Amino acid sequence: MKNATDKEVNKVLMVFFSATGNTKKIADRIQQKLEGMEVKVTKYDITSYQERNKVLSLDEYDAIFFGFPIYSLRAPRVCREWLERQEGNDKLCSVFFTYGGFGKEPAHYYIKELLTERRFVLVSTAEFLGAHTFNYSGWQAAEGRPNQSDFEMTDDYAVQTLQKFRARDVKTVCDFEKVKYTSEQLDQAEQFRFHLIKQLPTRDDKACTMCMLCETLCPTNAMNALKGTADAEACIACFRCIANCPDSVLHTNDIAAAWENKLNMHQTTKKAIDQMKSQIFL
Ligand SMILES: Cc1cc2nc3c(=O)[nH]c(=O)nc-3n(C[C@H](O)[C@H](O)[C@H](O)COP(=O)(O)O)c2cc1C
């Protein structure tokens, strides 16, 4: 519903990072919803390092959606580094996350802080459940998500955010409480994944057709298809290579044994995670 004082918002940019496809599914759904309301959406996928290194002009867009997975309680480091190079010039924006049903609060707080530093104006955020990346290695978190209820929430998010863009309504936005973890503590938490994923994506070379896709798609240029493994310094354990291998010959060590521990650490159960709902913050 438009008000007389509303500003035109007809061209929207959608910047997203998606290694295993969950965030892209939400981005696609937002695009579909907005285009149904005659808003043109241009998608810009920053998953590959080549795209992240291009200079992007934001001038021609009325507003921007950013979509990121949550990695170790925040937007992935490579996305934050990309954002640090952008100039917001008071452009209106919104951020949505996908996450695997564990920690997520600091992601909203820290993305707001970073976007404000870069002079973007945040009008809303949202979080959507997405099958946990580490399910490829034996976990069972948020399997089958995003699902129909997440997509319905996505539609609401798209509509409500568009209304806020048009009204330039930034009054109540995302008043996230100061989080209990400092950036330095979160940097340390980021390293924790390598305590679990001890063997980086590695090829079981029996059936490999050497298509090189793992190397081409790697977001950080870490994968070496000929060697059949990833560089330990550069790999961010995003599993893009594993998720997209047409021969299904890439794997890490099996972390199924760490699943119960993970649930206990978070004082939760598989059922509780499966029942979690996606949320919008206006
Ligand atoms: C390195 C890494 C760290 C992650 N950290 C978290 C986390 O802190 N909390 C959480 O709930 N999910 C976490 N996840 C799961 C992802 O946020 C989730 O699976 C997301 O939907 C993946 O998005 P994509 O399919 O677009 O890549 C992590 C995944 C990876 C690869």
Over which residues does each language-model region extend?
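Short, solvent-exposed loop/turn positions at domain surfaces
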Residues: R52, T229-A232
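DNA-binding recognition helix and immediately preceding turn/loop
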Residues: L196-K206
